[in-house]
Amino acid sequence: VHWTEKERTIITGIFSHMDYEDIGPKALSRCLIVYPWTQRHFSCFGNLYNAEAIMGNANVAAHGIKVLHGLDRGVKNMDNIVATYAELSILHSEKLHVDPDNFKLLSDCITIVVAAKMGHAFTGETQAAFQKFLAVVVSALGKQYH
């Protein structure tokens, strides 16, 4: 993947200003609510009965934060994202048996939450760079499935 300096600046800028404790829980909650079949991977998280329960679930919040910190690893290793996520790809495919399409669904939810938080600053150029980054991460996480 070729990253322009502008893309690198946009992506690192988004993550340097990101409130992980706000964005992470909101993004994962949104994914579990909008795509309820993704909940099957989180049965150990307790009550996921409805939107209110999901949004108030401490385990969902903690995992959402963990996901964003995982993305931060990709930001720090943009020139070697596949290797950065190799272990996570194996874990999600071989042990957790996560449908790789779920990574794309979550990345879409992350984009929506980040866009809502950034408002007018989330320009088309910003969205293009951010979604390119997430697409590369999603592809890397799915490598073990191929």
From Swiss-Prot:
One of its GO terms (molecular function) is metal ion binding. Belongs to the globin family. Hb1 is a heterotetramer of two alpha chains and two beta-1 chains. This is Hemoglobin subunit beta-1. It comes from Dissostichus eleginoides. The keyword Transmembrane does not apply. The lineage of its organism: Eukaryota, Metazoa, Chordata, Craniata, Vertebrata. Red blood cells. GO terms for biological process: hydrogen peroxide catabolic process.
